[in-house]
Amino acid sequence: MTVSQPDVTVVIGAYEAMPYLVDCLASVEAQTIGPDRVEVIAVDDGSTDGTGEYLEEFAERAAFPVTVVRQDNSGGPSGPRNLGLSKAAGRYVFFLDADDRLGHEALERMVAMADRHGTDVVLGRVEGVNRTAPRTMWDATLGRTDVFTSNIKFTLSAQKLFRREFLERHSLRFDESLWTGEDALFTMEAYLRADGVSVLADYTCYYLVGREDGKHVTKSGSYTRRFDSARALMHLIADMVPAGERRDSLMVRPFLITLAPQFGAAFTKDDEETRRHKFELAKPLMERYWHEGVARRLKVGERLRLHLVAEERADLLLDVAAFARSKKQAEAVLERKGSQVYLAYPHFRDRAAGIPDEVYRAEPSEARAFHGYREHTVGSFAPRAFRKVRRTFSRITARITSRSA
């Protein structure tokens, strides 16, 4: 065992993780970074399936330092992660779920990226195995970016490389009062406080594995916990980012990813009491954070659902949710020579419903998908304006010249 500081501490919180834990730990053993540059802190969170025993067996034969902590079940991933972080000695910390696995070069590449660019957080490309994974942020490798000028706000899971000194300086820890979405809160705050974020898009660093037994911890929990998560993230964003365009761009995330699904196709299956309760939980969030600056950043279907939530129109929302459940496509209505596209979801231009046309109007990013759409941009307007100014200037010049003569 080396006495020098390891480059990276891999923190693994494990609960009923067998047999997935076997491949998880094997992926750490296979890292090209070398055993002298890594350590593992593994916390068995009250497992009964042999997880703790396998961790201890692995610790005895591993070529790098492995610390195993066994404790009673804490009820969620926050406690084990915080405990692992408190024992970490590495310059960097990587949070690895016991169900998942690393690409062989993941740690070496991510540490090199952070060292090269001096960034506090590194995102490594993620691929899903029997489950979906975030995609929109992997278009290009970015040495240095931030949460406002990239799509990283759509990946708020904890499976990233963090500079440990940075986490300690800001006392960043996972909120143990949240049963879901605790990683979103932690990661968003890290993004906002970080001196730069790197995106490693040209190598798959992390394999997000879907469990066949359906016991993946992040998929559990009632709808009330989703509202708790949305509320906490919205409050964090509001506390850390002044009102305006930048805050609106981040608020899209909790509205789109956490809140909108509560009022989607599955809303039609909720009983009357659950529907009423969801509206009650959403009301203070809609009143405080929902406005045009957020709404215009959403696609029409999502914007319409949330508009109806804000207006407390459960009757109309049921029709929209049923339409979503049918998987039908809303008809595009092109007006003003194709420069405006409206999507005819239920109650479009229904006078009795009274929903403004603007709610149904597609923003350019969505409208471009429809044949016949003609985008009016500053670029197309400027030449016309310039020609008009030039003609006016020419007439004035001609008059002055005529009078002088």
Regions from the language model: what does each represent?
Residues M1-A230, A353-I355, V359-E363, A405:
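Nucleotide-sugar donor-binding/catalytic module of glycosyltransferases
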